[in-house]
Amino acid sequence: VNVALKPVLPTPALGAERLALLARLTEGLAPAELYWISAYSAALASLATRIPGHSGLAVVADTPAPERAAERLSIVYGSQTGNSKRVAEQLAKKAEDAGLSVRLLRAGAYPLRELAQERHLVVVISSQGDGDPPDDAIGFVEFIAGKRAPKLPQLKFAVLGLGDSSYPKYCAVSRDLDARLAALGATRFAPLGEADVDFETVATEWSQAALETARQALNATAPANVRHASPLHAVSATPQHSRDNPYPAAVLENQRIVSRDSDRDVRHIELSLEGSGLRYEAGDALGVWPQNPPVLVDQWLSALKLDGAQEVERDGRRLPLARWLGREREITRLTRPLLAAHAELTGNRDLQRVLEPEQKAALAALLESHQPIDLLREFPAAWDADKLVAALRPMTPRLYSIASSPKLVGEDEVHLTVGVVEYQAHGSTHYGAASSFLAAAGDDAAVPVFIEQNERFRLPADGSRDVIMIGPGTGIAPFRAFVQERQATGASGRNWLFFGNRHFSQDFLYQVEWQEALRGGALHRLDLAFSRDQAQKHYVQQRLRENGRELYAWLREGAHLYVCGDATHMAKDVHEALLDVAATHGGLSADDAKAWLAELLQQGRYARDVY
């Protein structure tokens, strides 16, 4: 049973200035970190005043750092979408059960000054887009890569990287981190692990092997003797429905929200969570398990001359081939392993050549521009049904930024903003698995969903803080939720939205809602950039520069800034625009501007939900 309790706060013993400082320092922290601070503060108070009943309380300061570090396994994760965090949490739980003293931290919360005393360290980290670290891990990665990193001759470490092999810089962050730690004198106690999009099997096997080595190194005792240096996480009820057990959500509404003249299809979709037990907050994502378009499954069977009713056994399950292609395997994404298998079957020299190490750019371009159906038609091959299922990547869920606040629409429904992927290329119709599935979902459909928390993309706890939101295209989704939340909670801070798309008359998503929000005071500023309405294209980053003086003033006064949308181009262009704003209107040097933005990221005042 989930019961929302309003905390009863004691009369503050701090002055206004110290109270404000405390609010700034704790803003954006995860529940586990707040619990730790609470225990730490209580322990300090006990030691200072010797309050009766506070005997035997363990605090981090009660033993020398090297001694504590030698007795524990530190697990640090850097996660953008939650996968690395999930793997790290599972590893921490297994290590705890095995009798190890464990410290689990997100990379952004890791105390870098303690790295020199660390003895046993595991890092689980993902690589984003063009080999970039997750936002919350930038400081951690840059410190280890930089000149201030200490020599680490006493450290034993292991690194697991999560990535997507369709990108040229697959697992680049973990590879660089692994090499750098070794260069600093540290010793691997497990080889570098690399897990593709279907990461579960690799991550599980790597974790088991790494944990066994760690147990031997730390001489793990029985679980009953475990003593943690710091709490792993707050105790919370496990939801009935999760990634592995999604809830079949009924469709309440599925509405096209671009004009009939638009060459794009964007949907506003409302789903019912009634009876699911799922709870979310503004800023979270909804995981959707998609189904491939039936027409595409038929095209595959036709191109391969295979029978959809033929049963195939894989992963302990025996299913018809059509079911494997429809629900269990990725058939809209061309991957390097599938391309390699197909090239071997066809014996085609051109396909084999693009897989050579010096052809990384050509391979990346091919994987980006083609879908598997193009390959099957252009380079026919005699695929066996069993080998085909084995070669295809397992289906993975897609994450959509939630476009509603439960405080306004209620806890029993959730809204999405979905850009439908469907276009012609190479003589075929290219589909997006999840977006096509959602676009076709009618009143009788059940959409398998789960909640993916995004703790680093939260509104400020202090409702008087100003908020700046940058969300072109479907990146507008979480900011619809943010404005709803601010409206429902009566937040007094100002809200400034930057939105961009192609055409004002065709693609102004939620136009009526934003106009009403402006009139009603829920939105204080709205700056728009429509790229195709004039000869010279206008984008949101230009609006940032044009409003740079006021934008910088808001940030200097404590505003929180959020970015959502395309990671490949938009997010990087926006970041560059923010650097320009800091240099132009703050008088900062290039290095100081970078340091300023890095500090905002570290403080949680600059947050990105990019994909």
What are these regions (language model features)?
Residues 1-611:
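FNR-like FAD-binding dehydrogenase module
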